Amino acid sequence: MKILFFGLSISSAWGNGHATTYRALIRALHERGHRIIFFERNAEWYASNRDLPEPPFCTLEVFESWDAIKARVRKELQDADVAVVGSYFP
């Protein structure tokens, strides 16, 4: 399956318990053969503390603003099987 995640951050676990949960879940989905794209808004407090800037188990799309990424999101949603929107997603 193709699964899109919209979440707070997967690239930085700094002050962010969401990242550890996302990492475990998405790693397990990847190991089962699913294709994952994670959309994360670029936030300075996470950008300066990224401990996983290129996750090996998903495609990470860091974006500056919703307007800058919404055309890409619409395109990816067309053939996605699942879209997951996490809490605190801007």
Regions found by a protein language model. Name each.
Residues L8, E40-N42, E64, V85-F89:
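Structural motif
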Residues M1-Y46, R50-D51:
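N-terminal subdomain of nucleotide-sugar transferases
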Residues N49-A71:
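Conserved nucleotide-sugar phosphate-binding/catalytic loop shared by glycosyltransferases and other
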